[in-house]
């Protein structure tokens, strides 16, 4: 994986790489099971720092996936994500609840008829296993997603 352009695969053979070969790896730094990379490994790669999600990006993604959603209400779901993102950046919560896939899954279940509050509990809140953290995340959801909203209000 360096300038020699080959890999030795134990028990197999030496594999020569085309000049156009690239490897892309991802790492969720700070997640359980990850640790600091050693200097020798880091020196072999370039690092792409991914920016935090913006309201504009989230709106584009969610409008594409949910074109029939009420725009004002969709903005509240985006607000939940952005509020949680800020809390995670400030160290108030872990990044477990900061889950775009969970938000999308919650919106899909709302579209199928589940209440927005229950869907957010399943898709976002219940990703936290610490009771204190779960309460914080639930409070963020409660501020933006009223209990009386139904799936028909969103879609």
Question: What residues fall within each predicted segment?
Answer:
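C-terminal regulatory/interaction module of P-loop NTP-utilizing enzymes
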Residues: 1-155
